[in-house]
A protein has these predicted regions:
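Secretory-pathway luminal glycosyltransferase catalytic domains
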Residues: 1, 45-171, 175, 283-290
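Nucleotide-activated donor-dependent transferases that construct or modify glycoconjugates
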Residues: 1-12
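Short His-Asn-centered micro-motif
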Residues: 9-11, 39-40, 146-147, 183-186, ...
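A short, glycine/small-residue-rich beta-strand->loop->alpha-helix junction that serves as a flexible
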Residues: 11-20, 154, 158
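Histidine-anchored nucleotide/phosphate-binding helix
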Residues: 19-30, 165-173
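Gly/Pro- and small hydrophobic-enriched strand-loop and loop-to-helix capping segments
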Residues: 30-42, 235, 247-278
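Active-site regions of enzymes building and remodeling cell-envelope glycoconjugates
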Residues: 53-56, 196-206, 250-252, 268-278
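Donor-binding and catalytic core of enzymes assembling or modifying cell-surface/extracellular glycoconjugates
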Residues: 176-262
Length: 290
């Protein structure tokens, strides 16, 4: 890379927003012969660094440094970047500040899945993944369930109540009593409600408080376990499950209360992946309906 050709990606808000900005920026930077640097803004209370979650060998820039660069003529490209400025290639430094994935030089959406799949999780995340995997999921078919009930978008709360998940889980269990569920939930109350109605499920319990390092590491572990499922019941209007789908290289079907997909547990007999840290390497069964 040429040392003075850089792209700084300013990441903020939730994990899904941050990762799609940083990883699409990484893909764009590579395509344009630029070095990637990134801002991991902790002003919203996000305690962990990106390097607490994945090994990420790129330079982190402070929000203050990024804002000073803005004041000295390196302004942010913001929001949905549909078209790069005509002179962008001549700029030694580009700063992007958005919650959306970038588009490439031709204006097409960047597929940042390959960059996600090349990341290596930290030992703390790996330990969480294998604790759940070895205890309840290894060698079994399972369906992922991801519930957003804490500080969720109003569209998510309205369209994806806990009762909808419970109803679908009961139907899937009736189809195949041997199917296990892996539950990813951001609410202890929702987790209890599911277990009371459906019975025991695979779920992380020692997850810590919202936005703490422990909690976000647990969320990353959830992503890999959801990615290794035969299919996922997910919330409407959420950026979390799409990360798991990219980890699986789009091999999992995601059903929510508003889309046309419908999972089936009929005929699921074995695991979908052999290594939960590599959910893109699929084995056989998938839970999509005909």
């Amino acid at each position: 890379m040429v040392a003075d050709r850089r792209l700084i990606a300013y990441a903020q808000l939730g994990l899904g927003n941050r990762m799609r900005v940083i990883l699409s920026s990484l893909a764009y930077a590579r395509s344009q012969n630029r070095d990637l640097e990134y801002v991991w803004d902790s002003s919203v209370g996000m305690k962990p660094a990106l390097t607490d979650l994945w090994r990420f060998p790129y330079r982190r820039v402070s929000p203050l440094r990024s804002r000073l660069l803005q004041l000295t003529g390196h302004g942010y490209l913001k929001d949905r970047i549909a078209e790069w400025p005509s002179d962008v290639d001549r700029k030694p430094l580009i700063q992007v500040k958005t919650v959306h994935a970038l588009k490439d030089a031709a204006g097409e959406p960047i597929d940042w899945g390959p960059q996600l799949r090349e990341l290596e999780t930290t030992p703390a995340v790996q330990d969480r993944v294998f604790r759940i995997w070895n205890d309840r999921l290894a060698g079994r078919p399972y369906i992922g369930v991801q519930i957003r009930a804490h500080d969720a978008h109003p569209k998510t709360v309205e369209a994806s109540p806990v009762e909808w998940f419970i109803g679908r889980m009961q139907e899937l269990r009736a189809d195949n009593p041997d199917v296990e569920f892996f539950l990813s939930s951001d609410s202890e109350a929702a987790t209890k409600q599911v277990i009371d109605a459906v019975g025991p499920v695979a779920v992380q319990t020692d997850i810590g408080d919202y936005h703490t390092t422990k909690r976000v590491q647990a969320a990353v572990a959830d992503l890999y376990l959801l990615g290794g499922a035969a299919g996922v019941l997910g919330p409407y209007w959420s950026s979390f499950v799409p990360i798991a789908r990219r980890l699986a290289d789009d091999a999992i079907v995601v059903e929510d209360s508003r889309n046309d997909h419908r999972l089936s547990a009929v005929g699921l007999e074995g695991p979908s992946v052999a290594d939960p840290l590599r959910p893109w390497e699929r084995m056989n069964d998938r839970a999509d309906s005909a």
